[in-house]
Amino acid sequence: MALDQGAKVFGVDIAASPAPLANHPNYKFLKADLCDKQTPKDVVQACVKMFGGRIDGLLNIAGIMDSNQSVDSVSDEMWDRCIAVNLTAPIRLMREVIAIMREQKSGNIVNVASKAATSGAVSGVAYTASKHGLVGATKNVAWRFKHDNIRCNAVCPGGVVGTGVHNEMDIQKWDKEAMKTMFLIHQSHSCDKDKGIGLRAEDIARPLLFLVSDRSKGINGAILPIDNAWSTI
């Protein structure tokens, strides 16, 4: 969608690049693990080199779910992984781009948080804590660098149809007792999918592109729900 609007895009993921984008002249890709301490620096340096020295926007989209484990059942492995991917990696990427954005006296950052970033009743403790942390970091960056003409906002999507996230998870490892306490909350949102009004990836992408563009000038430190009113409960 960003490419369709004329943007130059540098993508990074632990998975391979989408095949349809491979030959696009304005798209570059680095296959890497964002949890590696060196990766954020490598990503930003490569982006600057390939696209003429500027970085106008950063979209922190990468993230992982937990298994809805509560504080009494979460493993160290799950906790560390969620914090590393959902919180530490985006902070490191922001740290790297801030220097460039301050020098060019402009820049827009958008972090993808979650409904779990503003609630304690929709996910496990690791995912919830990581997304709450990302919202806090978003507000801190927005306030700290507003005089440098740098904006930082976050979006909080609800469930997204067609992502296949839950299909990739081992249901046997889920905290079933915790899931029972969340059932009605999840049910109140999943009915949107049943009625054909569930959100799709493009419904999240459009607000992301708005916030990372100059069309959203003045919007800074905002936490935007994209969940068809799920955030009202």
Swiss-Prot record:
InterPro entries linked to this entry: NAD(P)-bd_dom_sf (IPR036291), SDR_fam (IPR002347)
GO molecular-function terms, A-Z: oxidoreductase activity
Active-site residues, Swiss-Prot/TrEMBL: 127, 131
Organism expressing this protein natively: Aspergillus terreus (strain NIH 2624 / FGSC A1156)
Residue ranges of coiled coil: none
Lineage, broadest ranks: Eukaryota, Fungi, Dikarya, Ascomycota, Pezizomycotina
Function as written in the Swiss-Prot or TrEMBL entry: Short chain dehydrogenase; part of the gene cluster that mediates the biosynthesis of terretonin, a fungal meroterpenoid that acts as a mycotoxin. The first step of the pathway is the synthesis of 3,5-dimethylorsellinic acid (DMOA) by the polyketide synthase trt4. DMOA is then prenylated into farnesyl-DMOA by the polyprenyl transferase trt2. Methylation by the methyltransferase trt5 then leads to farnesyl-DMOA methyl ester which is further subject to epoxidation by the FAD-dependent monooxygenase trt8 to yield epoxyfarnesyl-DMOA methyl ester.
Protein name: Short chain dehydrogenase trt9
Effect of loss of the gene: Impairs the synthesis of terretonin.
NADP listed as a keyword: yes
Entry EC number(s): 1.1.1.-
Annotated family: Belongs to the short-chain dehydrogenases/reductases (SDR) family.
Gene that encodes it: trt9
